[in-house]
Structure formats: C-alpha cells, structure tokens
C-alpha cells in the first residue's frame, strides 16, 4: 500500500471517532484541551490496537486466499465504507442524549471500541495486501488521536452541523482506498 493510500486509510478510520468526538464535545459545557486530549488518547490507543488484532486474524486466513486477496480487501473496505455512509445518513440522536458527567474512562473506552470495529475489519483486509501493519496501525492511531482531540474541541460549536457528514465522507474515502487497492493489484497483474 502506498503512503497516500495509507494516509487516506488512517483519516478514513478516524472519521467515525471524529463524529463521536463531536458529540462528546457538544455534551460538555466548555470542553478543555486536556479533556479533549485525554479523549483523543483513549480513542487513539484503541484504534491502534484493533487493526493489529484484525491483521493477526487475517494472517491466518491469508494463507488460504492469496490468489484473490485484493478482492477480499476491496470487498471489506467497500462494505465498511457503505456501512459508514449508511450510518451517516440515518437519523440517530443517541450522542445528543448523553449528559456531561458521562465522560468517564469506561464510557469513552466503550465508545472508542464501538467506533473501532471497522478498524478491526480493516486490519483483516490489510493482511491481504503488502503493508507494514505497525506503521498502518500507528498512522490510524495517530490520526484518530488528532481527529478526536479536534472533534471534542469543535463539538460544542459544530456537533450538530457536521457530526454525521464526517462519517459519510469517511465511508467514501474507504471505498476509494478499496478501489485503489483493487486497481493496483489488477494493473500489476497485467
């Protein structure tokens, strides 16, 4: 996977967490930078671990599917991208119902894990392409940390305007990354 695709993948993986962070920030009276950074670090750590776990699962499966691995990666990213777009379109006000006191470590960790399920599946897909999983996981984790920190700070102002649109954009980016992987493999085979 080339560096540009990796960058787009990392940003795409962070958009659902960014959308959740907007909601978290919107529910705080005055988000402080340390609270935003703490939230970003929790989300980023979980988003770093989940693709590695998925990659490990994918490594076991990769031995059985080497001839069609690029189709697996494309299909996973396509399905995840479409799922993110669907979630961005459907009406869901759960984030707005949370109260400011619910920003405990465990609430943030559970929210972070819920938004990182797609990173777990992407990790499975990454097992089928030529990528350094440590670099990919760190890129995803760093992008998530930065995006969530910014999301919490922007949440109070932009939470209701941008929240779900970020997830739609992330879904589109995932589909483009998947199509790029498929194109690279098919053009290399010619």
Curated annotation (Swiss-Prot):
Disulfide bridge positions per record: none
Entry keywords, A to Z: Cell inner membrane, Cell membrane, Ion transport, Manganese, Membrane, Transmembrane, Transmembrane helix, Transport
Places the protein is found: Cell inner membrane
CC per GO annotation: plasma membrane
InterPro entries the UniProt entry points to: Mntp/YtaF (IPR003810), Put_MntP (IPR022929)
GO MF term (any one): manganese ion transmembrane transporter activity
Membrane topology: Multi-pass membrane protein
Transmembrane segments: 3-23, 41-61, 69-89, 105-125, 133-153, 168-188
Pfam families according to UniProt: Mntp
PANTHER family noted in UniProt: MANGANESE EFFLUX PUMP MNTP-RELATED
UniProt function note: Probably functions as a manganese efflux pump.
Family, similarity comment: Belongs to the MntP (TC 9.B.29) family.
Stated name of the protein: Putative manganese efflux pump MntP
């Amino acid at each position: 996977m080339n560096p540009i695709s990796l960058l787009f993948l990392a940003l795409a993986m962070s958009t659902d967490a960014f959308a959740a962070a907007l909601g978290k920030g919107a529910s705080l009276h005055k988000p402080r930078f340390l609270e935003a950074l703490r939230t970003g670090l929790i989300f980023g750590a979980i988003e770093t671990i989940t693709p590695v776990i998925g990659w490990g699962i994918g490594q076991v499966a990769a031995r059985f599917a080497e001839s069609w691995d690029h189709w697996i990666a494309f299909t996973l990213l396509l399905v995840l991208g479409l799922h993110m777009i669907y979630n961005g379109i459907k009406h869901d006000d759960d984030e707005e119902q949370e109260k400011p006191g619910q920003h405990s470590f465990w609430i943030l960790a559970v929210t972070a894990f819920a938004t990182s399920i797609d990173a777990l599946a992407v990790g499975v897909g990454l097992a089928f392409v030529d990528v350094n999983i440590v670099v990919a996981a760190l890129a995803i984790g760093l992008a998530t940390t930065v995006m969530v920190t910014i999301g919490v700070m922007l949440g109070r102002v932009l939470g209701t305007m941008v929240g779900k649109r970020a997830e739609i954009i992330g879904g589109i980016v995932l589909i483009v990354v998947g199509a790029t992987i498929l194109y690279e493999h098919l053009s290399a085979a010619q």
